[in-house]
Amino acid sequence: LAQAPFKITRRASREQVSILREFVWLQMLNLGQKVWGIAVSDAHTVFGNGVGGWRTYIPSSSDEPEEIEWEEISRRAKAGQMMLTTGPFLQVSTKDGTLPGGLTRANDSLSLNVGVQCPSWIDIDRVQVLINGRQSSEHNYTRIKHPELFQDGVLKFDQQLTIKLSQDAHIIVVAYGENFDLKTGYGKSSQGTNKPCAYHNPIFIDTDGDGFTPNGDTLGFPIPTAKMSVNAVKEQLSKLNTPTK
């Protein structure tokens, strides 16, 4: 849910440019580059370094480990049917059953089924729909403004949303815990300060019957390049009233 493809961070006493890959990914999708998102994680020390900060979920015909077929997992992964998460379990599909990575046909609106489940030690309080990479104000659901849409059990959110469309689009849903963290699971690890977050690969929508056409929108910023200077990034952020840090 970043507002720019980069930010200024500090390492020791020196400022540096950090690229926000998720934002760049959205820019790439708008330029027609179908790159699937996948989450990976590792550990570098035994103490104080959480393991499995991000995970990737892929649908399977069976929940029994011995019955899971690698051919099916490979096929679904190549099709982009993946959900990325730090904990929340997000499921999104269209009314006709199209999953992330798929292409479906719609006229002026799309029915989207969105479900979010969480274990007892984490929670989410926001569900945001991205339409062509931009955060839709109409589809920004929070516990504060839309308490009737959220629940307190394992199932946190279970709604069918109607998304109005005027052109071809790719849709991504983000489930987020703005007022929560992962400290219960990660303890003293720095990953404990991360937020519960889940999102999925885009669902592509064809509104005019000629397939999906990307809109070319780079979301207000040029695609980041290597060795961008701190001053150049600060200048770009200041022009759009975006915080530099």
Where are these regions (language model features)?
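Active-site-proximal segments of metal-dependent phosphoesterases and phosphodiesterases across multiple
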Residues: 1-19
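C-terminal functional module detector
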Residues: 9-12, 22-245
